[in-house]
């Protein structure tokens, strides 16, 4: 949002936000625009990796650990003919790419990989990864949401004494 910083007005359980033009909209709409709008954080050329690093950006160890977890899920499910791996809030697909690379060949051959992300599919992403705006249904395998909750705008927050 260009112009002055947004201001917030508490309206009971809902918070409204004014943009620089003085237009009011819900917190959810404002957060969605700031993250995924035409000039939003996740649509900028540098992406999140230009501002911070998460476990997927640091090394392949995290993706290998998730691949081991997926293999355990596969075994627990009795090695189904099709095993799904769904990465929620996939960013630029780094985790799902790393998981596919770390899987044993027999598991990788049965794995359907999904990257769930609102931002556009990155160029050059592995063709085996299906890019979706919402999770597929049904899922037989692992739905992994490592980064997803970071990006869910909360319209109502409640605290207690603890």
Say what each PLM segment does.
Residues 1-3:
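Short, positively charged low-complexity motifs
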Residues 144-162:
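A mobile, often basic/glycine-rich helix-loop segment
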């Amino acid at each position: 949002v260009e112009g002055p910083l947004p201001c917030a007005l508490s309206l009971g359980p809902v918070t409204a936000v004014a943009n620089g033009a003085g237009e009011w909209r819900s917190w959810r709409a404002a957060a969605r625009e700031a993250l995924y709008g035409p000039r939003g954080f996740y649509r900028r050329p540098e992406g999140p990796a230009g501002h911070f690093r998460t476990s997927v950006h640091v090394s392949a160890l995290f993706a290998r650990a998730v691949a081991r977890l997926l293999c355990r899920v596969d075994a627990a499910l009795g090695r189904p003919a099709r095993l799904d791996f769904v990465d929620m809030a996939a960013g630029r697909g780094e985790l799902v790419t790393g998981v596919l690379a770390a899987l044993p060949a027999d598991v990788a051959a049965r794995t359907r990989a999904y990257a769930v992300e609102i931002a556009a599919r990155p160029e050059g992403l592995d063709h085996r990864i299906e890019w979706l705006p919402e999770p597929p249904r049904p899922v037989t395998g692992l739905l992994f949401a490592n980064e997803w909750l970071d990006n869910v705008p909360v319209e109502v927050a409640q605290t207690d004494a603890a």
